[in-house]
A protein has these predicted regions:
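Residue-level signal for pocket-adjacent positions within structured domains
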Residues: 14-16, 63, 92, 101, ...
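Conserved RNase H-like, two-metal-ion catalytic cores of nucleic-acid enzymes
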Residues: 1-87
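Mixed-charge, glycine-rich, non-catalytic linkers/tails in nucleic-acid processing enzymes
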Residues: 113-172
Length: 172
């Protein structure tokens, strides 16, 4: 997920990375990263990804597509509305994630070894959960429903596209 500092990504099955966005967001290597994020041939898999997508769109200059939100898909296959990622992983993979660093100070640098491990553990199951949900959607005949929900989210994000910092400052 994306948040206030150490950002973590599952790049491909079996490969994960931690990117310290505040340290590298304006560097040349990040330009290639944003190209990958916006590559239409690569499906981006997120959990409760609205804020992540907003930040990606802000930094990349456009909304990354296509994307798959595991929280939306989980609701469509019967896991309940707004299922937490840890609960979904436990139900789908039978693994209890350590959430001790959920409310850690992600803005403090350097990130601790424990924070880095937490961040990497947080995406380890993202692609297997995605595959499980894709299969369940297909078996239940709900793949199109999910695609429609993702399209609605995309339209919603496009309609409210603005600098996240500006949006934060407008909260009263």
């Amino acid at each position: 997920g994306l948040g206030g500092g150490g950002e973590w990504l599952a790049l491909a099955e079996g490969v994960a990375a931690v990117i310290d966005f505040p340290a590298v967001q304006e560097t040349a290597p990040m330009a290639r990263f944003w190209e990958l994020v916006c590559d239409a041939r690569i499906e981006k898999v997120l959990h409760a990804g609205r804020q992540d997508l907003e930040l990606f769109a802000h930094h990349a200059g456009r909304l990354p597509k296509p994307f798959f939100d595991t929280q939306i898909a989980a609701a469509m296959v019967g896991y309940g509305a707004q299922t937490a990622y840890a609960n979904l992983v436990q139900r789908v993979q039978g693994v209890k994630l350590d959430k001790a660093h959920t409310f850690t100070n992600w803005s403090q640098r350097p990130l601790s070894r424990e924070q880095l491990i937490y961040a990497l553990d947080d995406v380890t199951f993202l692609l297997p959960v995605h595959q499980h949900l894709r299969q369940k959607l297909s078996v239940m005949g709900r793949s199109e429903w999910a695609d429609e929900e993702f399209a609605r989210l995309e339209v919603s994000l496009g309609a409210q596209a603005r600098d996240p910092q500006e949006r934060y400052q407008r909260i009263r």
